Amino acid sequence: MNNSSMASEYILRSMRTLKESSDAFNDGDMYYTALRLSETLENMSNVLLSLYGILDISFSPVEVLGFLEISREIDQKVKGIINEIQDLWRQLSALKMLNESPTKAPSVLTRGQEMKLILDRVTSLFDKVQGIFDDFHH
């Protein structure tokens, strides 16, 4: 499988997990929304890594983006996207660790308005990553 095909697969996965996170948000399930948004960020990270020929199965793809930033010549637009992915990843990682109540199903301390902002940021970020993917093919 070449880099472009792999990146294409991760774009499709990103679309799917972003839709699942949106559906979970609409159902009021903040924990599952956070989980799926994290997966979306991982998939978007894999899109960027694949486009630049980096495949790493040992670490989180979001963490490997730092290697991409220092090992390849990338423009400021891509660096900005990398920083935004990493920032959102840190926010979501903290949210997923905190459970509201041990007697209920898993939940997070964030409320709908805050999660909506994160969902909107990830959606916007997806559009940017898809734009980079498209730029690679034109």
Question: Where do the PLM segments sit?
Answer:
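Short amphipathic alpha-helical/adjacent loop interface patches that line ligand
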Residues: 18, 37, 126
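Long, charged low-complexity segments
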Residues: 49-138
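Charged alpha-helical initiation segments
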Residues: 1-32, 138
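Residue position in alpha-helical solenoids
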Residues: 24, 43, 50-51
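Solenoid-repeat scaffolds in large eukaryotic assemblies
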Residues: 33-34, 40
